Amino acid sequence: SNTHFGSLVLLIPLALAAGRIADHEQDQETKLEEELARVLRSTAVQDAIDFYRAFDLAGARVVQVDDFSLKDPDWERKLIEGNQSLLELMRLSLDHDIVAREWATDFERSFQLAGRLQDMVSIYGLNDGVVRTFLEALAEVPDSLISAKFGREKAVEVSSLAVDALLDSTLNK
């Protein structure tokens, strides 16, 4: 459920931003990035509360944090008193959670990887292009879900395995 939950947390603001610009013919990519930034900055405390409730219902797992922890029985009161928007919560976790980092950086890595994916697919075809892009992304940044479930050391080990896979000559056939 973590993977699905994280995917939705990334896709929902993208879909909302894309829907807002769908009728315009100009530079869609630039407009998408700009509209996405507006969507993220428009989040409020209620969005953070709803996110926490959904997070709890989904049984998603992340690295434990000190501030605004879901394990804290007073998390909702603290969110309200701290006037914490969903974007502000994501900024608190950007150093240890990939999804939070995307929110905090206006999806910078997602847009970079989209361009890389496009290039890889044009060179290697759909399947191999997707696999290569995924391996490169995993090699560059340890996966926060692996880190949450098995520890940072294991996540770094998996990233190292992705590097090895990219260096394997059979991948280039």
Where are the regions that the model predicts?
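Short intrinsically disordered, low-complexity coil segments enriched in acidic
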Residues: S1-N2, V158
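Phosphate-rich cofactor/ligand-interacting catalytic cores and adjacent structured alpha/beta frameworks
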Residues: A18-K173
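Catalytic-loop motifs flanking and including active-site residues across diverse enzymes
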Residues: G6-L10, V130
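Mature, well-folded catalytic/scaffold domains that follow N-terminal targeting or propeptide regions
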Residues: N2-F5, K173
